[in-house]
Design a protein with these regions (language model features):
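Condensing-enzyme catalytic core mediating Claisen C-C bond formation in acyl metabolism
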Residues: 29-104, 113
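Conserved beta-strand-centric core segments of catalytic alpha/beta enzyme folds
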Residues: 1-61, 159-225
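Conserved small-residue
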Residues: 18, 55, 73, 111, ...
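Stable alpha-helical structural segments in soluble proteins, enriched in small hydrophobic residues
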Residues: 96-104, 131, 135, 167, ...
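Conserved beta-ketoacyl condensing-enzyme motif
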Residues: 6-17, 108-124
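Acidic-glycine-rich active-site phosphate/pyrophosphate-binding loop
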Residues: 19-33, 69, 126-145, 192-196
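Beta-strand segments within the central parallel beta-sheet cores of soluble alpha/beta enzyme folds
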Residues: 1-6, 68-76, 109-116, 143-149, ...
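Short glycine/threonine-rich loop-to-helix capping motif typified by GTGT followed
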Residues: 82-93, 119-136, 155-162, 195
């Protein structure tokens, strides 16, 4: 089974729609630093384009044919809070993460790394940070979090696919990818953000979040095999 996503919406309609919602960064004079998840000076996301696909296969079948196994997709969670078309709430993301943990048979403290949705919007980054702290409690300070959208921008329908690939590679390489462009972390984003440089660490289990406009939330849990 192939699972992933792709999207290419850098066009007048795509950009115009998100601009009319005031979702995009206006840092046009400094585009390389415009996408800055969790930074106090973030002002919206930068649209990107791309794709990411994973090959999903039953474990024994993959072993029998000698496939290279990167990790196990052990849990998923979905929720729809329908709170507001653009303004998020914490209950939907919390439920999505809880469901993924339950499906994987893990506790919050079992997660070593979180690849966040982290779009660089003023409200969204704070909301996700609060949801993470609500679920993970004291473990939040140990949980390493990064948003790779600082480097890629927001791929919209392609974001979950490519960021799942990043999460799988983090487990393979035992390295948390950095969140770039975080100069001054917003104190309201009270999570342990991996900033600037990759962080070599043990990653036994990792979580991937994607939270869409309208309150559509999805979470995956991957584990080292």
């Amino acid at each position: 089974m192939l699972a992933g996503g792709t999207e290419g919406t850098i066009c007048p309609v795509g950009i115009g729609g998100f601009d009319s919602m005031h979702a995009l960064s206006r840092r046009n004079d400094d585009p390389a630093h415009a996408s800055r998840p969790f930074d106090v000076d973030r002002d919206g996301f930068v649209m990107g384009e791309g794709a990411g696909l994973l090959v999903l296969e039953e474990y024994e079948h993959a072993k029998a044919r000698g496939a290279k196994i990167y990790c196990e997709l052990s849990g998923y969670g979905l929720s729809g809070d329908a709170y507001h078309i653009t303004t998020p709430a914490t209950d939907g993301p919390v439920r999505s993460m809880q469901m993924a943990l339950k499906h994987a048979g893990l506790k919050p403290e079992d997660i070593d790394y979180l690849n966040a949705h982290g779009t660089s919007t003023s409200v969204g980054d704070v909301n996700e940070s609060k949801a993470v702290r609500e679920l993970f409690g004291e473990h939040t300070d140990k949980l390493v979090v990064s948003s790779t959208k600082g480097a890629t921008g927001h791929l919209l329908g392609g974001a979950g696919g490519i960021e799942s690939v990043f999460t799988v590679l983090a487990i393979r390489d035992q390295v948390a990818p950095p969140t770039i462009n975080v100069v001054n972390q917003d104190p309201e984003c009270c999570i342990n953000v991996c900033k600037g440089e990759p962080q070599k660490m043990e990653i036994r289990a990792a979580m991937k979040n994607n939270f869409g406009f309208g309150g559509t939330n999805a979470t995956l849990v991957f584990q080292r095999v």
